[in-house]
Amino acid sequence: AKGVARIAQALGMKVHAYDPFVIDQQSNSSDVTFHDTIESLFSSCSHISVHCAMTSETKGMVNSGLVRRMPDISPNGVQCGRHIVNCSRGGIVNEDDMLELLESGFLTSLGIDVFENEPYANPKLSAHRSVSSTPHIGAATIEAQERIGEEIVSIVSSFFN
């Protein structure tokens, strides 16, 4: 999530976040607006990128009720639509709700690289013209594989020391 925030800031975006597990959120970063509730976050943002673990609390968390809170105008008044990206875990975003919101035109776009039932994606959702999907290959970059290798070396080294 921090990497996405850095890229968003480099592109001139104002970054907002919600994390129920971080107690003193305001002290973590002066460049990020933290929200006390997920409802507040969705009510403030036209672009949402989901980065969380799958738990009983997060299953189906991003649903029609939350997305319908999203504005379609940026803070500086530009009509930009509503956009969601999910690269965390399948099942956190309610796929049926997203398809309904896309078909109605309420949701402008959905970027998704994880599906509730993998490896078989929801065919109607993945075929929608406003959906950009990949087959869960987000970690298949050279940089990601290098970081994984470095982490493995660190863990093995710590074990033997």
Enumerate the predicted regions with their spans:
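Rossmann-like dinucleotide/phosphate-binding beta-alpha-beta segment
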Residues: 1-72
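Rossmann-like dinucleotide-binding domain for NAD(H)/NADP(H)
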Residues: 68, 72-161
